[in-house]
Amino acid sequence: MGKTVKVAVTGAAGQIGYSLLFRIASGQMFGTDTAVEIQMLELEAAIPAAKGVIMELEDCAFPLLQKVTVSSDLDIAFKDINWALLVGSVPRKAGMERGDLLKINGGIFINQGKAIEKNAASDVRVLVVGNPCNTNCLIAMNNAKGIPSDRWFAMTKLDENRAKSQLASKAGVPVKEVTHLGIWGNHSSTQYPDFYNAKISGKPVTDVISDHEWLKGDFIKNVQQRGAEIIKARGASSAASAANGVVDTVRAIITPTASGDAFSAAIASDGSYGTEKGLIFGFPLKSDGKKVGIVQGLPFNDFAKEKFKTTHDELISERNEVKDML
């Protein structure tokens, strides 16, 4: 067996946490030769529920799970961790705008950023899942300036998976045939799922799917609004699919990307594609297993440029609303 990875999961007793923890403990995130220690962070009121989840984890007798703890103390939960999965945030309810959440969540992510910088291992990497995840990530990162900016990620993999599923269904092919599907910008209803640069069975999507009006209309709208649709149908936000997105993101970061493919996550922009430097912006990415880089040189037509600008403008606006927290 290889090394042991220490993982902090915030909001661990919540619905996403509940779906996620068992997949981490079973080896689906870090692989079957890597032992894991899970350090759960929860609000004091949720500690009893978290202890129930710990009992269930113990009862699974996962060979890779070395230890699992829960605390409401940031310093304890983030001690010596290699990965921080920041799942917990004040949840979005039906009818609530994302803007309402910015200030509410800002204080949470200021404190978490500071505590991660103070307590985590020197190689720590952070994935923010709790919404609004791009700006929550921006706040945490700017309050942990001792941690290199290339260690911070916000999740857009769920959007990528949603988009792949829609394209596969429309084309009548298995979802694995859809590759190089980038999500640009914000994990919000302005995100741009880039079908122009994606492939189905190695061919451009626009060659395989002849209904270009669907691609430019319902496809994008379906991906952008999917989270809201699930809240409407289920009475609660995406949980198992979000947890799956977390597993997929971490695996994509730590595993070399297949030739000709890419994966989606939001990272601190280096100015690529004219984005404002330092914004947490969604890009198509490649990994060599250690370092992650932005896929360069992708073409944009006028339609794509307009979609790109809309999501970029929204992220600038979100950043401006939380400037005093950065």
UniProtKB/Swiss-Prot annotation:
<dbReference type="InterPro" id="IPR001236">
    <property type="entry name" value="Lactate/malate_DH_N"/>
</dbReference>
<dbReference type="InterPro" id="IPR001557">
    <property type="entry name" value="L-lactate/malate_DH"/>
</dbReference>
<dbReference type="InterPro" id="IPR001252">
    <property type="entry name" value="Malate_DH_AS"/>
</dbReference>
<dbReference type="InterPro" id="IPR022383">
    <property type="entry name" value="Lactate/malate_DH_C"/>
</dbReference>
<keyword id="KW-0520">NAD</keyword>
<feature type="active site" description="Proton acceptor">
    <location>
        <position position="187"/>
    </location>
</feature>
<feature type="binding site">
    <location>
        <position position="105"/>
    </location>
    <ligand>
        <name>NAD(+)</name>
    </ligand>
</feature>
<feature type="binding site">
    <location>
        <position position="162"/>
    </location>
    <ligand>
        <name>substrate</name>
    </ligand>
</feature>
<feature type="binding site">
    <location>
        <begin position="129"/>
        <end position="131"/>
    </location>
    <ligand>
        <name>NAD(+)</name>
    </ligand>
</feature>
<dbReference type="Pfam" id="PF00056">
    <property type="entry name" value="Ldh_1_N"/>
</dbReference>
<feature type="binding site">
    <location>
        <position position="92"/>
    </location>
    <ligand>
        <name>substrate</name>
    </ligand>
</feature>
<keyword id="KW-0560">Oxidoreductase</keyword>
<comment type="function">
    <text>Catalyzes the reversible oxidation of malate to oxaloacetate.</text>
</comment>
<dbReference type="GO" id="GO:0006108">
    <property type="term" value="P:malate metabolic process"/>
</dbReference>
<keyword id="KW-0816">Tricarboxylic acid cycle</keyword>
<dbReference type="GO" id="GO:0006099">
    <property type="term" value="P:tricarboxylic acid cycle"/>
</dbReference>
<protein>
    <recommendedName>
        <fullName>Malate dehydrogenase</fullName>
        <ecNumber>1.1.1.37</ecNumber>
    </recommendedName>
</protein>
<dbReference type="GO" id="GO:0030060">
    <property type="term" value="F:L-malate dehydrogenase (NAD+) activity"/>
</dbReference>
<feature type="binding site">
    <location>
        <position position="131"/>
    </location>
    <ligand>
        <name>substrate</name>
    </ligand>
</feature>
<comment type="similarity">
    <text>Belongs to the LDH/MDH superfamily. MDH type 2 family.</text>
</comment>
<feature type="binding site">
    <location>
        <begin position="11"/>
        <end position="17"/>
    </location>
    <ligand>
        <name>NAD(+)</name>
    </ligand>
</feature>
<feature type="binding site">
    <location>
        <position position="112"/>
    </location>
    <ligand>
        <name>NAD(+)</name>
    </ligand>
</feature>
<dbReference type="InterPro" id="IPR015955">
    <property type="entry name" value="Lactate_DH/Glyco_Ohase_4_C"/>
</dbReference>
<dbReference type="InterPro" id="IPR010945">
    <property type="entry name" value="Malate_DH_type2"/>
</dbReference>
<dbReference type="InterPro" id="IPR036291">
    <property type="entry name" value="NAD(P)-bd_dom_sf"/>
</dbReference>
<dbReference type="Pfam" id="PF02866">
    <property type="entry name" value="Ldh_1_C"/>
</dbReference>
<feature type="binding site">
    <location>
        <position position="98"/>
    </location>
    <ligand>
        <name>substrate</name>
    </ligand>
</feature>
